Amino acid sequence: MEDCNVHSAASILASVKEQEARFERLTRALEQERRHVALQLERAQQPGMVSGGMGSGQPLPMAWQQLVLQEQSPGSQASLATMPEAPDVLEETVTVEEDPGTPTSHVSIVTSEDGTTRRTETKVTKTVKTVTTRTVRQVPVGPDGLPLLDGGPPLGPFADGALDRHFLLRGGGPVATLSRAYLSSGGGFPEGPEPRDSPSYGSLSRGLGMRPPRAGPLGPGPGDGCFTLPGHREAFPVGPEPGPPGGRSLPERFQAEPYGLEDDTRSLAADDEGGPELEPDYGTATRRRPECGRGLHTRAYEDTADDGGELADERPAFPMVTAPLAQPERGSMGSLDRLVRRSPSVDSARKEPRWRDPELPEVLAMLRHPVDPVKANAAAYLQHLCFENEGVKRRVRQLRGLPLLVALLDHPRAEVRRRACGALRNLSYGRDTDNKAAIRDCGGVPALVRLLRAARDNEVRELVTGTLWNLSSYEPLKMVIIDHGLQTLTHEVIVPHSGWEREPNEDSKPRDAEWTTVFKNTSGCLRNVSSDGAEARRRLRECEGLVDALLHALQSAVGRKDTDNKSVENCVCIMRNLSYHVHKEVPGADRYQEAEPGPLGSAVGSQRRRRDDASCFGGKKAKEEWFHQGKKDGEMDRNFDTLDLPKRTEAAKGFELLYQPEVVRLYLSLLTESRNFNTLEAAAGALQNLSAGNWMWATYIRATVRKERGLPVLVELLQSETDKVVRAVAIALRNLSLDRRNKDLIGSYAMAELVRNVRNAQAPPRPGACLEEDTVVAVLNTIHEIVSDSLDNARSLLQARGVPALVALVASSQSVREAKAASHVLQTVWSYKELRGTLQKDGWTKARFQSAAATAKGPKGALSPGGFDDSTLPLVDKSLEGEKTGSRDVIPMDALGPDGYSTVDRRERRPRGASSAGEASEKEPLKLDPSRKAPPPGPSRPAVRLVDAVGDAKPQPVDSWV
């Protein structure tokens, strides 16, 4: 029994080795046969290629092709291809005897009766005979260059025909593996696919329907050698490809057609009917041609997504319904085929020779399609349609497309989310607020904030923040954005991109701010919402890390001398808005409040001035009274070096940083370095807000501006030919002049520039340079504040020839506000008896000043409810009507800055102010800093139209909003 087991094992081992050797020998023989047959076919093909046809030197119109069918193991797919072949019919039978090389051993062990054991080993050599039969025959070719399968002779059996792949490469046509049928006397055919070590030695699959390679600019066609089934041959006609529909010119570059559904492939499903809710003749179902490889799809800009690659390979879940599939490719860029043609669908090619664009209801219906690529490309095409087209935006809202797009923001596929957000960005752009309200009503703001928290793709974050920036220009949406997105915008974007760290490492260098598009969009959004009102300002001030991060970003910009970009502009505007009414709204402001001046503060100041002027230095009692009341009414010590700032037990943070004297140097640096008009206006406005109010910190701010040599910077900016810069600087100087020392310096060195602006209001130096009413009123109010309680400043006004300019303005101005403000200044000048003699010598009579004063109402010097002004940044005028009308096929992503995301809103115009106070007098020379940059040249700063406050009976401080 034991001998039988040993014998059986040995036999099995020998049989296995025999089979291995047999197949090895068979392989060698087949390889030799391949070379032999390939050589014969190549020799037979050369005469036909040389001789041509009809003596014209051209190849024969009827090409000799071999239709090869590969039959693999059961369950494998068949592939069809065409290849050149010799002109003769060849039928061969090859018999190969295979020597395994290593003989098979049979071992037997026999034990005799005497106990001896005998081992016998027998070597057996087996020969395997394999018969390989090949049949090569001529296949007729039709006029379209394709094999005639219908009505032609049967293809016949296809026996073994695995030609050498080197021949296939030399043949000049597409290649495919041939079917093989091994007839062997022993052993089975090895299972598994054959090795494919060459990319050209591949077989095609009917069911996969993969994209063909980009063989040339037009892509592969039927003439490129790919076999087309007869039933779908009409979809790929031979000859020139159909061009774009009439009236549509070809795009000049790849970016010209970035969006839209693709229609250059079609499924081989049984039914070619349109998808649900679509017209039957709209051929958006994919037509699939056999693959000859896969080409590369270039893109105009980086367009990555988390799982965008999955969309490219997705197949419809319902094979029997030819759903309107879009081109399955990543990104919003169209196929390269779109550059030169648009292939018609099978259905529409029979009815309409041209491909038609989808209707808007069809595009919106695709947003509900079960196939994700359809949703993604429909949203991208919708974004393309909405670009600079207010009518389409309105129709999308009327057809209730906005809720569909908002719902796609929570889609599991990143590509769908990205394209839906891009469509919402375009739909929310513009002055029409109906779309913004519709997005709010369907929960668009919370959905965008959720997407921002979840997205890690930079482009998605740009789209989300850009959409929020658009929505933030709509007044009712500002608090909605604050409620749902303030924390996310701050902690996800502002803090990380600003370079600020809550716990900085002392050993490492502070990080610089990153001026990314995401940061620009987010800061623009916060810039808009910061102008909503007191509650919005309170929420932003108390948001942890926001003020710290914004100041760090501005310090980084000043350090790198990069102060002209939009991100810096947005940050300064936010700081200006948050500084508005800071003396009233911040927690604990009551502790720092100083005594409010009475309504007759100017008269009290005049009495104090006359009492102090009783002697050369003033009376002793007056000096002692002033010393003990040191900082009353905003006054400060004559010697600035003795001004003690509050002692700190810990570093300031959060909203406390808004009004610290240290920020003065930052704003002055921006005023010195920047050439951006909006940045200059915002920085001057921030100083204007901080120096307003009767509290201790305003006193410190006014003194710090003088100490940091900021007065020459502001005075020089009065020469700017940009209207809004002159206005902001004039109001800032008015607030700073509440400091007595500042008033004397400004009166001596700024009066000439102020008077020049008054003259320009009457006679502009050039066409279009006329100052606006608000600017003229601001300049006149500043002059009035300077000459009040200051005889020397009134003399400076006379020396600057200001009286003739004021009288002419009263007589000729069409503005009631300008005339009243000028009358108040003239009335104040005539009140100084010391100047009346000089005025009369110059030919001025009392009647001139009385007639001017008769037009003014109210007590002398009471130009407004207060003597200082604080405001927020005016709302940026988007000027959509002045935009360039670019191609509707290109969405200017970089051009959608604050001018593109903000809209004009004239509803918020609330004048604010408080009373003025005089200060002790002391004069010091105003020195210019030689190291400071000169102001930007005038011609580069055109006048900017600004929404102004509604005219009032009294001159009102400018109070405008972002």
UniProtKB/Swiss-Prot annotation:
Composition bias type Basic and acidic residues, residue spans: 878-887, 920-932
Protein origin, superkingdom: Eukaryota
Keywords for this protein: Cell adhesion, Cell junction, Coiled coil, Cytoplasm, Methylation, mRNA processing, mRNA splicing, Nucleus, Phosphoprotein, Repeat
Regions of compositional bias (Polar residues) in chain numbering: 102-114
InterPro entries, A to Z: ARM-like (IPR011989), ARM-type_fold (IPR016024), Armadillo (IPR000225), Plakophilin/d_Catenin (IPR028435)
ARM repeat ranges per the UniProt record: 348-387, 390-429, 433-467, 468-508, 526-565, 575-622, 646-686, 699-738, 739-781, 782-826
Post-translational modification Phosphothreonine, affected residues: 102, 104, 642, 872
Compositional bias of kind Acidic residues: 270-280
SMART domains reported for this sequence: ARM
Record-listed Omega-N-methylarginine modification sites: 170
Subunit relationships: Component of a ribonucleoprotein complex containing mRNAs and RNA-binding proteins including DDX5, HNRNPH2 and SRSF1 as well as ARVCF. Interacts (via the extreme C-terminus) with FRMPD2 (via the PDZ 2 domain). Interacts with CCDC85B.
Function: Contributes to the regulation of alternative splicing of pre-mRNAs.
Family of the protein in this entry: Belongs to the beta-catenin family.
Protein name in UniProt: Splicing regulator ARVCF
Organism phylogeny: Eukaryota, Metazoa, Chordata, Craniata, Vertebrata
Gene name per UniProt: ARVCF
